[in-house]
């Protein structure tokens, strides 16, 4: 390797002689699951290849149109009926989906209690309206847990551990809506902003009351499950403070808090974890788990790019290396997944809904997006290795490495997220010189492609096909 090429190379290191922790598959989960219609064995196999530990049920009602699944208004469709009477519930379709997820895909279930997102505009709401009777909804939630964990209403004894109260109550006009809308009204921008702030405060106060009501009800009957939420849109400190304060005053402890993160900055996600831990500890909930249960790459155009109607903006959002599901997105995922393993996070769920389209893993022709190959690549690491070994990245390059349970296999994942270096030098301790290695490359031109890379003098050199994002797995 010449001096000139060294100037265009990042240098990272791995020490297989130094163990620093254990791999945690629970940090590699998703919302992807089976569907009632159009879910072939091929689709099941594709989901399995991505290797998710658990499946979160949020938005499954959207992916299963015309079916009564998961959402509480589907499970208990006539709200004025008696919630303690098992004959008033409709569980069959949800039973079928969860059974397929558990048995066919092999995932654990993370059950979101509440409703799927409702993009019906600022004034028209149906399922996402704030419930009139919090106690009634809490009783419906209890009936749901009882059905799946205790066999009630011709149910099951599946021992589903995690139950989440609602989703994104802080999201305007989609999830926790006032009857006359969440946007402010008034004759001037100032009046509208003031009224909007009033509505937001009211919505937050109502949700804190609802959250505590449901938490108390579920923990009183089911002390063995973990209950929490509420899957905020992001690590929103003011909202979490209000929620944790309400729990403390009610003397009920959430088992976990959850939030979402859509960004193109990996460190922003890691920073949100540190903030979550700090907040829970501050309010005395030191055993409260931290869960990010929606996360996804969001390109430089943000949500404006995703929802734009401008053909030029849409083309940049959905096509090329920097697109929503392109190689930058995939290497962002691999960077984040690697960092999760040594963070204070307890669980993480990559957001996917439907199999094709914006939030899928393939296009309408069945061609896999780059993110599919990246998620499959991480699965090969987290499910093959047991012990995390010491490693050090550099700049845009992130490294995670480890050994199998019996110590015979060693693996390394090297991810360069939007870097400009043409080569990556990997220095390795703990592997005898000259030992054969197997390398898989993932970049804008290659999808999970085996390449030959010699290992000599305690190092190997990974060559990128071009500047930008790329990832490699190395196996000894």
Q: Positions of the model-derived regions?
A:
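Short, acidic/polar
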Residues: 35-47, 147, 237-248, 329-337
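Conserved, mostly hydrophobic/aromatic
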Residues: 30, 101, 144, 163, ...
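Aromatic/acidic polysaccharide-binding cleft in carbohydrate-active enzymes
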Residues: 296-400
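C-terminal beta-strand-rich structural cap/linker in extracellular carbohydrate-active enzymes
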Residues: 452-476
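Mature N-terminal, pre-catalytic/accessory segment of carbohydrate-active enzymes
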Residues: 9-52, 58
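Noncatalytic carbohydrate-binding groove/subsite architecture in carbohydrate-active enzymes
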Residues: 198-333, 343
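Carbohydrate-binding surface patches
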Residues: 394-433, 437-444, 469-472
């Amino acid at each position: 390797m010449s001096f000139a090429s060294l100037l265009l190379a990042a240098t990272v290191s791995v020490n297989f002689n130094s163990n620093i922790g254990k791999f945690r598959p629970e940090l590699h989960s998703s919302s992807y699951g089976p569907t009632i219609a159009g879910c072939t064995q091929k689709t099941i196999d594709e989901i399995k290849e991505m290797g998710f530990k658990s499946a979160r049920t949020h938005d499954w009602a959207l992916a299963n149109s015309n079916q009564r699944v998961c959402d509480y208004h589907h499970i208990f469709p006539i709200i004025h009926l008696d919630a303690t009477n098992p004959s008033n519930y409709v569980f069959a379709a949800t039973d079928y989906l969860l059974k397929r997820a558990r048995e066919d895909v092999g995932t654990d279930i993370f059950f979101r209690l509440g409703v799927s997102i409702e993009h019906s505009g600022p004034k028209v709401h149906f399922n996402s309206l704030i419930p009139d009777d919090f106690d009634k909804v809490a009783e419906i939630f209890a009936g749901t847990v009882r059905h799946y964990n205790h066999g009630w209403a011709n149910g099951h004894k599946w021992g589903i551990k995690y139950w989440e109260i609602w989703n994104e109550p802080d999201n305007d006009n989609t999830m926790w809506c006032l009857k006359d809308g969440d946007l402010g009204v008034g004759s001037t921008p100032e009046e509208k902003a003031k009224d909007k702030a009033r509505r937001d405060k009211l919505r937050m106060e109502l949700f804190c009351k609802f959250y505590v009501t449901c938490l108390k009800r579920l923990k009183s009957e089911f002390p063995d499950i973990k209950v929490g939420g509420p899957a905020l849109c992001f690590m929103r400190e003011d909202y979490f403070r209000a929620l944790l304060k309400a729990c403390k005053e009610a003397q009920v402890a959430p088992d976990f808090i959850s939030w979402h993160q859509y960004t193109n900055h990996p460190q922003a996600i890691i920073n949100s974890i540190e903030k979550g831990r700090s907040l829970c500890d501050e309010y005395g909930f030191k055993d409260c788990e931290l869960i990010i249960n929606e996360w996804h790459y969001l390109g430089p155009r943000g949500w404006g790019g995703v929802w734009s109607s401008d053909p030029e903006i849409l083309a940049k959002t959905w096509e090329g290396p920097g697109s929503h599901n392109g190689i930058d997105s995939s290497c962002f995922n691999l960077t984040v997944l690697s960092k999760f393993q040594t963070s204070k996070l307890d669980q993480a769920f990559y957001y996917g809904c439907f199999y094709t389209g914006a939030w899928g893993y393939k296009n309408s022709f069945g061609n896999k997006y780059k993110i599919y190959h990246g998620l499959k690549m991480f699965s090969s690491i987290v499910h093959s290795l047991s012990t995390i070994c010491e490693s050090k990245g550099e700049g845009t390059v992130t490294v995670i490495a480890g050994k199998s349970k019996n110590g015979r296999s060693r693996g390394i994942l090297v991810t360069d997220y939007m870097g400009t270096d043409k080569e990556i030098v990997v220095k390795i301790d703990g592997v005898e010189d000259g030992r054969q290695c197997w390398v898989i490359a993932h970049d804008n031109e290659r999808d999970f492609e085996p390449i030959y890379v010699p290992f000599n003098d305690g190092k190997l050199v990974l060559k990128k096909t071009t500047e930008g994002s790329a990832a490699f797995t190395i196996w000894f």
